[in-house]
From Swiss-Prot:
UniProt DNA-binding residue ranges: 122-178
Residue ranges of the TM segments: none
Alphabetized GO MF terms: DNA-binding transcription factor activity; transcription cis-regulatory region binding
Keyword match NAD: no
Family in the record: Belongs to the AP2/ERF transcription factor family. AP2 subfamily.
GO biological process: chloroplast organization; ethylene-activated signaling pathway
Record's function text: Probably acts as a transcriptional activator. Binds to the GCC-box pathogenesis-related promoter element. May be involved in the regulation of gene expression by stress factors and by components of stress signal transduction pathways. Repressor of flowering.
Keyword Transmembrane helix part of the UniProt annotation: no
SUPFAM superfamilies according to UniProt: DNA-binding domain
Pfam families cross-referenced by the UniProt entry: AP2
Induction details: Repressed by miR172 after photoperiod changement.
Name of the molecule in the record: AP2-like ethylene-responsive transcription factor SMZ
Amino acid sequence: MLDLNLKIFSSYNEDQDRKVPLMISTTGEEESNSSSSSTTDSAARDAFIAFGILKRDDDLVPPPPPPPHKETGDLFPVVADARRNIEFSVEDSHWLNLSSLQRNTQKMVKKSRRGPRSRSSQYRGVTFYRRTGRWESHIWDCGKQVYLGGFDTAYAAARAYDRAAIKFRGLDADINFVVDDYRHDIDKMKNLNKVEFVQTLRRESASFGRGSSKYKGLALQKCTQFKTHDQIHLFQNRGWDAAAIKYNELGKGEGAMKFGAHIKGNGHNDLELSLGISSSSESIKLTTGDYYKGINRSTMGLYGKQSSIFLPMATMKPLKTVAASSGFPFISMTSSSSSMSNCFDP
């Protein structure tokens, strides 16, 4: 194998070699066995190129050194080092912040599992049921779901959930509104245990849903009137009748009606069930329905007066007689109260 690498031999310096013409000499097969492959002319002092077949290291000339590399540096290397240190410190602090953020997110996830937000409501612990058409509130306690009541609005159900969450889990519980809104309720919660508090919420939701009144036996109907369960008005307590008259249309904008059984100095204290209205004028006549209702609906101008009106006992008839004359069947009723037993004739 022949090594055809070109080798440059020169007796001058490197600067002079660039100015001297070159002569190429080749060696044939006859001179391959000789010890030298090329000769130089000392008089001409010319350089020549030869094939390095014999690879003589003595005649080899090292290549010229490469040109010096130009390096550029900052005018203020100290500032650059400071910037590097700042970058490293920022990266370290950012890494620490990431770890702290991850821990905080994990804590928040664990805390939100107590009361997950409902899909059907924007409030926590509130769910809308299409079957009933109401918003129901629930809370988890000791692995069980506690029913807090059904409400007509999501806001009322959310308020009930917040109060239950504060009662069960304290002031740090996840609620829908601000804790300061329940300062008045917190004072009442201290005197009640969990069972009593849940029963209180359920009672409020039941009365709110049915439109009940603060009076016993009254409920708000669709016609926006408070009516009783018994239209004959056979009640043991006259407060029920007072509430019915107060909240009906005939009682709107009128003065408070007084009943003869509760006024001192009235001689008709034995008035039990049938409540009527009478005036000084004899032209007003009571109908059969007035004995049942206790009100003469035909005289609308009567309510413009602010004076107290009573039904005299002389004009009243027993309920049994009125029922017989009007054609309505009379059903006798028994009660443990003495006031109820005295109302009917034997």
